Amino acid sequence: MTAEQALPLGNGKAAEEARGSETLGGGGGGAAGTREARDKAVHERGHWNNKVEFVLSVAGEIIGLGNVWRFPYLCYKNGGGAFLIPYVVFFICCGIPVFFLETALGQFTSEGGITCWRRVCPLFEGIGYATQVIEAHLNVYYIIILAWAIFYLSNCFTTELPWATCGHEWNTEKCVEFQKLNFSNYSHVSLQNATSPVMEFWERRVLAISDGIEHIGNLRWELALCLLAAWTICYFCIWKGTKSTGKVVYVTATFPYIMLLILLIRGVTLPGASEGIKFYLYPDLSRLSDPQVWVDAGTQIFFSYAICLGCLTALGSYNNYNNNCYRDCIMLCCLNSGTSFVAGFAIFSVLGFMAYEQGVPIAEVAESGPGLAFIAYPKAVTMMPLSPLWATLFFMMLIFLGLDSQFVCVESLVTAVVDMYPKVFRRGYRRELLILALSIISYFLGLVMLTEGGMYIFQLFDSYAASGMCLLFVAIFECVCIGWVYGSNRFYDNIEDMIGYRPLSLIKWCWKVVTPGICAGIFIFFLVKYKPLKYNNVYTYPAWGYGIGWLMALSSMLCIPLWIFIKLWKTEGTLPEKLQKLTVPSADLKMRGKLGASPRTVTVNDCEAKVKGDGTISAITEKETHF
């Protein structure tokens, strides 16, 4: 092994030319021909037209449904304002470091979610496969929420919302309009067994839910059409890559903020809103002694920041090499958390109003997840004047929040596949056909969640396939790979070459110690405190249902150890020799900025090397492995 192979830190010009020639199948033609081939390859892969497109695309991906329906609920559940303490701790120690790691890695390598890890450390290429498996699961089930929201939106264009009153064909005798409750009118109904019209609309009209996963039942064709509409919109948002995605996000990433602002203003002007906000923020410091509060804060960071999915790597790979991704990441992380915090005011002001109107404690109306989006909030708007208008705005906001998160996930998966096989998919309309194929396959797989028993399958996907446990597992290996194997100092050199300065040392130590330690602790807590999933805390799945859930969870997590085992098995030599070969970055992974263009001395993982301006190494000290 040569010194140049052991520590590839040069400017990478020759490597870029070689890669461009290889991508296009070229082999000769001299320097001019090679340069032309390289330029053509870069053009074919695409770049963002400007920084705004990148920022809006990332904002659209990370600012999604979880900001509206999960963070406010967790805040009130875990001590109100006191919950912000563990949230900020995880924000600094886990959120920003991993978010920045993935974005910077994509920008430095200009590769998708799999090939970036292959070039940095072949032994840990399984990280890329794990992220794409999680992403594939997400692509199938996340868009189901959009189908539900589209169905609700289609029912908003009436003078009276269909879930506001009883008397429809889907309502039962137990249906009671609580906000207009008159005991003489419901003498035949036991109030303990009564249900609301909004609940019956959700369970009987939308889901037509069966009594268990064992009874899948019929396909809900109306929802199937809504899902088809969602996938059609998603396809045309990304079918031209960054050319189309970069334009669409100007609408999809900004429109939800307009809707959120309108709903916030409306919410805080309602009677009872102040009590709802107080309930949301009132600090209960005693809750900080509960480990579950800290676990909830950590998992919320991972869920809402879209880390460990490969999305940030893919989006960052379309940046210009010298883009200041460090500043972008800090700004986007603050924007994401700020949006979650403000959304809590919009949600809990309305829940406070609903509790005020019904004369019940706010705890009885507070919901999380689909329960908030499709039961609690729709119920609240029925009590407002011009309720169809507010319902329309709310579901439009949900659709746009989910839409850009969905199509960015699909785009990231496509980017990973195309970068693995550039000669195959960067020709003609093959990339567009790949997106079409993935969309069609995901659509038909998703239909099973639109059956009468589909909600039970949806919950399995949500609780296992893309669970916090899977994300934490991937995050541990990402930090180990960059912090220890590739080397945090080396990666800081790469970042300095891109942005012109070195980030705070705190982030480097988070990669090496803090973040993997915290993630490992929460992961173990998950395993120790594991409780089998129950739908609505009532329905218990059969054993084979839990088996399917764990298979989906393991399908991503096992990618990493299996890949390590396979690579070690196939590589020749003793174990130390195998590790040495498999932990060396790709020889053409060069720095392309000012640092890579000038001679200098660099120290990476206790190795000191004299690097010439052409990217070769004139002298190198002992190269140690971290294994």
Swiss-Prot record:
* An MF annotation (GO) of this entry: gamma-aminobutyric acid:sodium:chloride symporter activity
Q: Which residues lie on this side of the membrane: Extracellular?
A: 147-220
A single Gene Ontology CC term: presynaptic membrane
Give the membrane topology.
Multi-pass membrane protein
Q: GO:BP terms for this protein?
A: neurotransmitter uptake; response to xenobiotic stimulus
Q: Mind listing the UniProt keywords for this protein, alphabetically?
A: Cell membrane, Glycoprotein, Membrane, Neurotransmitter transport, Phosphoprotein, Symport, Transmembrane, Transmembrane helix, Transport
Residue ranges annotated as Cytoplasmic topological domain: 1-53, 567-627
Q: Which residues are glycosylated?
A: N182, N185, N193
Tissues in which the UniProt entry reports expression? Brain.
Q: What is its main location?
A: membrane
Subcellular location(s): the record lists:
Cell membrane
Membrane-crossing ranges are 54-74, 82-101, 126-146, 221-239, 248-265, 301-318, 330-351, 384-403, 433-451, 468-488, 509-528, 548-566
* Region described as Disordered: spans on this chain: 1-36
- Which reaction(s) are listed as its catalytic activity? 4-aminobutanoate(out) + chloride(out) + 2 Na(+)(out) = 4-aminobutanoate(in) + chloride(in) + 2 Na(+)(in); taurine(out) + chloride(out) + 2 Na(+)(out) = taurine(in) + chloride(in) + 2 Na(+)(in); beta-alanine(out) + chloride(out) + 2 Na(+)(out) = beta-alanine(in) + chloride(in) + 2 Na(+)(in); hypotaurine(out) + chloride(out) + 2 Na(+)(out) = hypotaurine(in) + chloride(in) + 2 Na(+)(in)
The similarity annotation says: Belongs to the sodium:neurotransmitter symporter (SNF) (TC 2.A.22) family. SLC6A11 subfamily.
- Tell me, in a sentence or two, what this protein's role is: Mediates sodium- and chloride-dependent transport of gamma-aminobutyric acid (GABA). Can also mediate transport of beta-alanine and to a lower extent that of taurine and hypotaurine.
Q: What is this protein called?
A: Sodium- and chloride-dependent GABA transporter 3
Organism encoding this protein: Mus musculus (Mouse)
Encoding gene per record? Slc6a11
